[in-house]
Amino acid sequence: MFPRPVLNSRAQAILLPQPPNMLDHRQWPPRLASFPFTKTGMLSRATSVLAGLTAHLWDLGGGAGRRTSKAQRVHPQPSHQRQPPPPQHPGPYQERIWVGGEGWGEVGGLRLSKVGRRDREVGRGLRAPAGRGRAMGGMPRMGTVGDFGQALSSLAWTSTCFQDFCLPSLPGKLPAPLISKQQFLSNSSRSLFN
């Protein structure tokens, strides 16, 4: 597959692939031509590596139909080079979204790419542009299962939902504020925590 060097009486000859004639398809693989060198001291290991890369590029189809310059033509033979492995294209990335709660329940939302939640918030994701994820204040829009699952995992939305919808307020009385560390508890409620 690779050209082999031929020793001449004058100097070392290097075989490099030539561009194929586009009209004559019987000359595939490409013809090999020899170039005599009068000074063999110019050859070094770096130029042999470059020749190997040139031969690899030609084998991969990089030189078909193109003319090579003089700098690319005058290179020594390739030294023990391996052909690079073919590129591996990963398949589509699928991930199931799990929402914790009473037991583990599976929400069947499939995401087809590695786009994080932050990318969706700034408008680079697949779901919606920025600002469309929440329709009514803090409530998520019910368009897709994935958005609803992400809204359930948001602590800010669950606390506002719990205060607004789950705590009944008596007529004429506001609901009691949440207990913080600065508020003092009565004696009866202190005994519950001690």
Curated annotation (Swiss-Prot):
The keyword Cytoplasm applies. Its main location: cytoplasm. Pfam families: DUF5559. It is found in: Cytoplasm. Residues 62-93 are annotated as: Disordered. Expressed most abundantly in the brain at protein level. Present in cortex, cerebellum and midbrain. Found in neurons. Elevated expressions detected in Alzheimer brain samples. Also expressed in testis. Disulfide bonds: none annotated. The keyword Transferase does not apply. InterPro entries: DUF5559. GO terms for cellular component: cytoplasm. It comes from the Eukaryota. Keywords: Cytoplasm. Originated from non-coding DNA sequences (insertion of repeat elements especially Alu). Seems to exist only in human. This is Uncharacterized protein C20orf203. The gene is C20orf203.
